[in-house]
Amino acid sequence: MTIATVSTESLAQEVSGPSFRSLVRSAFEQDGIATEDQDLTKEFYLRTIEANQPKLETEIPRQNLRDDGPRIFVKKFEFARLVEFPEAGINRAEVETIAEDLRSRYMKEDDIFASGYTRTDLEELADYLNEVEATDNVKNLSGKDLQQLNNMMRKQNAERGVSYADLEEITNKLTLYYRSKGLFLAQVLIPAQEVVDGIIMLTVQEGILGDVVVENNEDYSVKLLKEAFKRNIDELVSHTEMEEGLYLLNDLPSLNVTGYFLAGDDPGETILNLKVTEDASWNMTTRADNHGSTFTGDNRISTSLEWQNPSGKGDALTISYLKSNSVENFDNDFGSDLGQFKYSIPVFGLRTRFEISAVYNQFKLADQSDESNSINLLEIEGVNKTYAISLDHKFSRSRAFNMSAAVSITDKETELEAIIEIDTGEHVRGGEVAFSIDALSQSVQTLNMLNFKVQFGEHQNEVDEARSNNFYKFALDTNSLIFVPLPFTDSKSRLIMKWRVQYSNEALPAFEQLSLGGANGVRAYNVRDFSGDQAALLSVEWYFNMPEVINVNVWGGKRLNEVFQFGLIADAGYGSLNSYEADSVDNWAALAGAGLTFKLNWEEKFAIQLSVSHPMMSKSSEGLNSSEASFVDEAKSAQVYADFSFFF
């Protein structure tokens, strides 16, 4: 037989090069079970729809629409309480100047002549004198005319001054001035008083945070919940800081918090009342997909169990298991069994989170679609082990802008066994620094996310003399959502663009390479087709709403567009392998594909995603799409990826 004539030397040579590591890379992946791909459209609506935002009730009091009532002749506003806040740009002189300008405007002093009458008043009196023909001679005025003239002058005098409604408008305008300076709880009030000599007293409640009280909390301690606002006590209440505090609390596992303000015990103080709702302490996700590798089985099923806040300190424990194999042989030893443990807890406050994780993946490689593949002769099996500790810190947390950074230390190892001695096992220790930022814009309806990572690794096992003992890797991921108007309609489509780029000038371990194909790459190809040390991927998804004529109610008040999405997809990628062998060239490949994608989800119960993509172009240094052997021709049909997730 032909198979029997293959020498062990040729097999060993075949598995020792970078091409082999690229082909079986997916079996060496160390990062554990992948989480759900973030739905940018859902994230955009969660941030922009008011009902989904952490509640902070801070409504500016509306004007009391009562009758004007009697008018008051106001000579001056004085402040019974006015504290200066230079850091907010508020000083007594400026506030008093604004109050005086408002008093003068509402008193209409600029319209009053030296006689004490306005032009309108004088014109009204002149019209009456002309009517009774007394313009030139007051002797023509009868007693009745004089009485009427006197009544008119009394009425004019009574209408001068400031009404109750005017005073309310003045205090509201002063309140808006304070809030424009960031004191969003400040109020200018008129205390009960008797007006003497036209002087009206005003008082300012600036909105100093006096205390934080908590209600309805069960597992979370009051001390932990107050932590988000600890530095704001006895300080001016800032909308930005209050919003950030609520978001930091709502980032904690199983916690939902809203807030509202109450009057404080001391003048100018306010109390923040936190109303707590705690969700279930655990959740479970079961997922089935065909995103796996040919050599460990395309079909995968995984289950993740998360225990939220077990200690009452905002921690989370996640235990996961994944099994990959083929549908025909799901009970044999071919494929992989992966277990994952992850625990995280806040440290040094709510902004910083410590995480420890471990991944153990036992696998056996085989190519069941091609029995003559040398992979089957080698009987390769092995274990991946990953240990990591990390610190993640949130510098800014809000609805519109977020910024964070993380530092990690990792230990990643792959052990391999085969019927012959092979040296493709890897053991790397290193660290990485990651930076994340996202920004929401409602004016142009966009959501942009960016992640940048610098990674260092040092080989713990012996490597080829021509190969460096350590490496650096730079990675950049971007994710953007843009709403695009459709011509001749009022509808908007949703365009999502994703970039994934990584660079290294060294030959990387297989588990650090970036795969060009697969469900997270060019979806017209398999995850095993090519992986690179240097690579770039672009994915574009263009989603459209269903026409209103078929946007029917499906069930439970949900309309079709709320649970179903469809769109066009296009992917392209380029990657290369850094060769360290003498007189060798770097292998490279370029792939592209296009197709359709469909998504169906129902609240937090289940989610289904399906993509159908056809190869459009493929080229490589090894003739992946040369004139002699076209990978597109070999593919014959579109690649289909599907995943089903159920949430409990």
What residue ranges belong to the model's regions?
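Immediate N-terminus of the mature polypeptide
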Residues: T2-A536, W542-F648
